[in-house]
């Protein structure tokens, strides 16, 4: 029990709340077994506005999703639908659009364009003595505080939302600072921009690792090679190819 069925957290669906918060603990007590330290009740969900039914044919098969999108992306697509403690609707018809907007064009594109600039402008070797912009530090600190608070309270939807707001802000930072123009003009601020991007990306990788362990392992491996100066501009990460 201690290894395969620990009592730290008992996760149940709303429809069996009574049985698992009243009867199940009573059965455990009568058997002399430890009670759950916490019980998390997740909400019920519909699929594209309908109850999930084999007859209707709208059952979501996680294995099919993993085959189509990869296990990490499938996990994200499900967890990012709505807060787990609430009832909600899974927009399965929109999975491809959400994959492309959040993963391919979102975090995937941010990492790709940032790493390409680091390789192209500095051969991947950044001077760590350069400062990191305070606004990026402050943004990361705020995001991390909210992320950790949500994660510790099993608010995974909210934790992911915080990370993807940070991703959008880092994308906006690139567009505002225009590192390509700084490189063309030999502006010394370029190193500060690249270091700030690296700092932000390392935070993103750490935050997303519990949700996307395989993809973030790929990103960390790529980043290690980049820092060693082992990569060329044509060596793409290709984390989330468009669908």
Residue ranges and their predicted role:
Residues 1-14:
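Active-site cores that bind ATP or allylic diphosphates and position pyrophosphate for catalysis
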Residues 116-133, 153-162, 174-184:
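Short acidic alpha-helical/loop segments enriched in Asp/Glu that coordinate divalent cations
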Residues 37-44:
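Long, charged, glycine-rich C-terminal linkers/tails
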Residues 138, 145, 149, 154-155, ...:
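Basic, alpha-helical terminal appendages of large translation-related enzymes
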Residues 21-31:
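Short active-site loop/helix that positions an aromatic residue
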Residues 20, 107, 163, 213:
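Residue-level signal for inorganic ion chemistry
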Residues 13-16, 65-69, 95-106, 132-139, ...:
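Secondary-structure capping and boundary motifs in well-ordered enzyme cores
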Residues 44-131, 224-243:
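Catalytic adenosine-cofactor/nucleotide-binding cores of aminoacyl-tRNA synthetases and other
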